[in-house]
């Protein structure tokens, strides 16, 4: 991209933008919630649409001059409905957290009981964490993973639902590597008269391409981000049954947001179009293949994988047998050019700022073109770095740079 105007106007910011570009180009990105957008998505984000304020919805705006952005938003809505087979879509949420908030405000009152996945077992802050608005406003009861299998035990979820009679059951996760059974969760919700909301922020790309079962036929509401496996701009979206469309839209605007970000909605529309192409399914298939190979390679080096593997794009690694914390592993690997994040593991004994594990994802490196052989090399580099954490890391930095040079970012 051309940043001539930025360089003339603000050298400091232009310099930092360039530094970040170089960091991304010369690092192996394993953060499961990150990806690299296409140039088309990036151009939409930096377009003239950023100038337009458009409170309301297409044909029902509070400002004039919205006929063009109405077309943009309609395109985004229609494309994402086609992508997921949904009855209604709202593409205005600024983030996944705000998408979840809008659903809660649509069907809950403060103090209502909600069943959601424990953050330390792979859930998300907005699924009831006490430090988040969700845990402060609503009475969340948490379910987790089985101590032995480290996967969701649906009978335990059912028992909790029968005991606490939640008004809403929340499914989905930020660090869960296995298939989620939405049909069974729908049956549990029906048994106790609860709504079902599924947060597919991490697995949206897999769901869109049929590589993970879709929650759309079963859930009352489906929320997502657009910047993870969907490979779009940072933002959120909500899908729902038509009967909830009016109340949902009201709880985005005027409920929790004002004017939508029309340049971001345009970029969402572009990413939905890209996701409808056959090449996107090929990409997502490679994401999953890469995750499987990377998981197997790490396991061969003696790393303990939570639930012993993965069905999707991410791997949760328990480092308790490697004499290193998640925090120290994150810092160590960052120093050689591999970026990932510390993460709690089931039955965690350390604080969330230290943790016993790391979370690894393959979407971003797959976007660059990395395939199975590169996964084996990445596993080898990670293993060598942790084994030689107090030694000379320069050879490992060189191996990382060699991989990055082989697959340019843009």
Swiss-Prot record:
InterPro entries: PyrdxlP-dep_Trfase (IPR015424), PyrdxlP-dep_Trfase_major (IPR015421), PyrdxlP-dep_Trfase_small (IPR015422), Ser_HO-MeTrfase (IPR001085), Ser_HO-MeTrfase-like (IPR049943), Ser_HO-MeTrfase_PLP_BS (IPR019798), SHMT-like_dom (IPR039429). It is an enzyme of class 2 (transferase). It comes from the Bacteria. Its cofactor is pyridoxal 5'-phosphate. Belongs to the SHMT family. The gene is glyA. This is Serine hydroxymethyltransferase. Catalyzes the reversible interconversion of serine and glycine with tetrahydrofolate (THF) serving as the one-carbon carrier. This reaction serves as the major source of one-carbon groups required for the biosynthesis of purines, thymidylate, methionine, and other important biomolecules. Also exhibits THF-independent aldolase activity toward beta-hydroxyamino acids, producing glycine and aldehydes, via a retro-aldol mechanism. Keywords: Amino-acid biosynthesis, Cytoplasm, One-carbon metabolism, Pyridoxal phosphate, Transferase.
């Amino acid at each position: 991209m051309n940043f001539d105007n930025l360089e003339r106007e603000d050298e400091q910011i232009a310099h930092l933008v360039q530094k970040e570009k170089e960091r991304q180009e010369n690092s192996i990105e394993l953060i499961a919630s990150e990806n690299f957008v296409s140039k088309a998505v990036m151009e939409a984000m930096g377009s003239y649409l950023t100038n337009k304020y458009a409170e309301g919805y297409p044909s029902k705006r509070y400002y004039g001059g919205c006929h063009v952005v109405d077309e943009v938003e309609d395109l985004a809505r229609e494309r994402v409905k086609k992508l997921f087979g949904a009855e209604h879509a709202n593409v205005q949420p600024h983030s996944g957290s705000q998408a979840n908030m809008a659903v809660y405000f649509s069907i809950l009152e403060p103090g209502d009981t909600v069943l959601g996945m424990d953050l330390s077992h792979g859930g998300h802050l907005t699924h009831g964490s006490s430090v988040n608005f969700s845990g402060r406003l609503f009475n969340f009861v948490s379910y987790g993973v089985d101590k032995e299998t480290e996967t969701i035990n649906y009978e335990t979820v059912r028992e909790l639902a029968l005991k606490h009679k939640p008004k809403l059951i929340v499914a989905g996760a930020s660090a869960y590597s296995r298939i989620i059974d939405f049909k069974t969760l729908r049956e549990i919700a029906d048994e106790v008269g609860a709504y079902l909301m599924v947060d597919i922020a991490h697995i949206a790309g897999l769901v869109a391409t049929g590589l993970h079962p879709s929650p759309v036929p079963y859930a009352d509401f489906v929320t997502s981000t657009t910047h993870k496996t969907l490979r779009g701009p940072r933002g959120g979206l909500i899908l729902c049954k038509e009967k909830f469309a009016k109340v949902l839209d009201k709880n985005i605007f005027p409920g929790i947001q004002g004017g939508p970000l029309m340049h971001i909605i345009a970029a969402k529309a572009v990413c939905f179009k890209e996701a409808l192409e056959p090449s996107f399914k090929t990409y997502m298939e490679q994401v999953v293949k890469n995750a499987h190979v990377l998981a197997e390679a790490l396991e061969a080096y003696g790393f303990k994988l939570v639930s012993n593997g993965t069905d999707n794009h991410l791997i949760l690694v328990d480092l308790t047998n490697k004499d290193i914390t998640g925090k120290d592993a994150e810092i160590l690997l960052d120093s050689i050019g591999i970026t990932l994040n510390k993460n709690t593991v089931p039955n965690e004994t350390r604080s969330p700022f230290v943790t016993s594990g790391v979370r690894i994802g393959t979407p971003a490196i797959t976007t660059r073109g990395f395939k199975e052989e590169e996964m084996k090399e990445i596993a080898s580099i990670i293993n060598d770095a942790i084994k030689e954490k107090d030694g000379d890391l320069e050879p490992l930095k060189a191996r990382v740079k060699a991989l990055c040079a082989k697959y340019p970012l843009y």
